[in-house]
Amino acid sequence: MSRFNLCALLFAGALGLVRPGAVWATAPQAIPEIVINVDDQELKVLKEGQEVAKFPISTSKFGIGDDFRSYKTPTGVFQVCAKTGENLPVGAVLKGGRFTGEVLPPNAPGRDPIVTRMIRLKGLEAQNRHTLARGIFIHGTPEERRIGKPVSWGCIRMRSRDVVELYKQVPVGTRVVICGTGRHGFGSWVAKLWS
């Protein structure tokens, strides 16, 4: 078991996502899985249990949670339920799931719209049941200089080139696990304890 998977398992237990005595299957998976570590601001793609890609991200500046109007990043188990932006140019501004015709360069000043691609998430647990209604996405941002810090309004932000790559790798139906305590850097600290 990789350190990252162990970290995810520890956080899941700490957050009450794992019942005492639960058995975790370690069999390889046929489709990819996304694991997002809020503490390390990192997204990993796993295929057949092996890490195939890793990207820096940005989650909510308000911490973790799922309440309406909280602007927090929800945690737990999710599923990719829709994808938007196929074949759009990098920096394409998306509003209401539609291309506006505007294209922004990285780090364009003044605004922070959703750009390039949108990967919509649906919560699969009671603790994240509002995710779909809240409009929580994995998406591109023009504020690329801020990636790696928790600065979003609840969504998972990525650099445009990274979200294009992720979009190609994950189909609708992909399982997504978002874990962490909401304390930036805590995941690395726990991983070091186990090394």
In which residue ranges do the predicted regions lie?
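Positively charged n-region of N-terminal signal peptides that target proteins for export
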Residues: 1-4
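Bacterial N-terminal signal peptides
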Residues: 7-18
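A ubiquitous, low-specificity "background" feature that marks scattered single residues
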Residues: 11, 47-50, 112
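Intrinsically disordered, low-complexity
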Residues: 21-70, 75-77, 88, 179-195
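Exported/periplasmic cell-wall-interacting domains
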Residues: 26-29, 67-69, 88-195
